[in-house]
Design a protein with these regions (language model features):
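Short helix/strand-capping connector loops at secondary-structure junctions
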Residues: 121-140
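Glycine-rich, flexible loop/turn motifs
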Residues: 4, 85, 128-129
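C-terminal or internal capping secondary-structure element at the end of a domain, subdomain, or sheet
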Residues: 136-164
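Short, low-complexity, charged/polar segments at coil/turn and helix-coil boundaries
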Residues: 13, 17-123, 154, 158-164
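Acidic, low-complexity proline/glycine-rich segments
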Residues: 1-9, 112-116
Length: 164
């Protein structure tokens, strides 16, 4: 009586290859979560009432890094907005006077403008932040477990079927 171990050996080799590629797989999953968080941030910017910023620059400047950062057994990815005023929209700011003037429906900033300017926010008050990044991360974490399981199962099935 004999036993054919060829398929079992192929399966063992496939598992060894998957184990060797695990850093690459985890990187792909984590970067995908960053992309999902960016999509959520853009959706929040688009659908928030009242509108966050009219021009769309704030919405279009959300990005995530294309490489995951490993720290021990955990991974992270950066999600960011590099606009100069992004931090002020995220966390809020003190009310202040802005020199300049109106030309039609557009405010033109001009330092030491003799025509005056406008006061942003309530007098001696605080303009509350919109917390877009915080809300996007919260939305991402709500569905993260199911999304990661689905992606990981798909990746593992592809890699296991590739070798058989």
């Amino acid at each position: 009586m004999s036993v054919d171990f060829r398929d079992l050996i192929k399966w063992r080799d496939n598992m060894a290859n998957i184990a060797a590629e695990m850093d690459q797989i985890m990187d792909e999953l984590v970067v995908g979560e960053g992309v999902y968080a960016v999509k959520q941030a853009k959706l929040i910017c688009k659908n928030d009432v009242p509108d966050i910023v009219g021009s769309g620059d704030y919405r279009n400047n959300w990005h995530s890094s294309d490489k995951a950062i490993r720290n021990g057994r955990s991974y992270k990815v950066d999600v960011f907005n590099n606009l100069s005023y992004a931090e002020h929209l995220e966390y809020g700011f003190r009310s202040h006077f802005v020199p300049g003037h109106w030309e039609g429906n557009t405010f033109v900033y001009q330092r030491d403008d003799p025509e005056g300017g406008m006061y942003v926010g309530p007098y001696k008050g605080f303009v509350r932040g919109r917390f877009v990044l915080r809300r996007a991360i919260k939305r991402t974490k709500i569905t993260q477990e199911a999304r990661l399981k689905r992606k990981l199962n798909r990746i593992l099935q592809e890699r296991l079927n590739r070798g058989l």
